[in-house]
Regions:
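A short acidic, Gly/Pro-enriched loop at the edge of an enzyme's catalytic core
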Residues: 52-64
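Class I SAM-dependent methyltransferase SAM/SAH-binding core
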Residues: 8-53
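Class I SAM-dependent methyltransferase "Motif I" SAM/SAH-binding loop
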Residues: 3-7
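A short SAM/SAH-binding and catalytic strip from SAM-dependent methyltransferases
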Residues: 63-74
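Conserved S-adenosyl-L-methionine
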Residues: 116-127
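Conserved beta-strand signature within the Rossmann-like core of class I S-adenosyl-L-methionine
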Residues: 91-97
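A short glycine-rich, Lys/Arg-flanked "PGG" loop and its adjoining helix->strand segment in the class I
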Residues: 77-89
Length: 185
């Protein structure tokens, strides 16, 4: 997984889907340090690395995962070239992320023109909006429990609490969330 962050998704996949090896990579050294200290799963390892220069040889992975990380990449097309380089022939790229209405077409075009075959593409914005709505109260409680008071407003915006800018942008379709499954030829 490129952009594994705090490692929760990587840990879940390693424990429940039991791949031979699962590698979580992130460009935040503090996150990788946390992941290495917190997760103790036999088939899971974490490394520091840059999505624009994935530190693995060509044709190395069966599957590469990228969830809610790429919206922060300055050179998305370079990242896609790296994905294609490190995937084995017939390997899969599983991708999910959001963009605002101005940049969603660029994202879709970049993925479709990546040189990998698009197996599936779906707009899941409505699902994300409904999930934010459904999980609203639990996330509010977490904000008030774990964040100092001066960060409450920021926390509400960051996690998309009802009526926040993030929440409303999914509701009014100014922000869209897509997932793709691509395959290297």
């Amino acid at each position: 997984e490129v952009g594994c962050g705090r490692g929760g998704g990587a840990s879940y996949i390693a424990r429940y889907f039991k791949p031979k090896v699962f590698v979580g990579m992130d460009n935040a050294k503090a996150e990788i340090k946390f992941d290495k200290n917190y997760y103790h799963v036999k088939n899971l390892k974490f490394i520091y690395g840059d999505a624009m220069n994935i530190p693995f040889k060509e044709n190395n992975f069966d599957i590469l995962l990228n969830v809610e990380s790429s919206h922060g990449y300055v050179h998305f097309e370079k990242f896609l070239k790296e994905v294609k380089r490190v995937l084995k022939p017939t390997g899969y790229f599983l991708f999910a992320d959001f963009r605002n209405e101005k940049s969603i077409k660029t994202l879709i075009n970049s993925l479709c023109m990546s040189g990998m075959k698009v197996i599936k593409k779906e707009d899941i914005s409505r699902n994300v909006f409904h999930a934010l709505n459904f999980d609203n109260e639990r996330r509010i409680k977490l904000i008030y429990k774990y964040l100092p008071r001066f960060l409450h407003r920021w926390g509400r915006q960051f996690v998309g609490i009802r009526d926040s800018k993030l929440y409303n942008s999914f509701g009014n379709r100014k922000r869209k969330y897509f997932y793709f499954i691509l395959q290297k030829d």
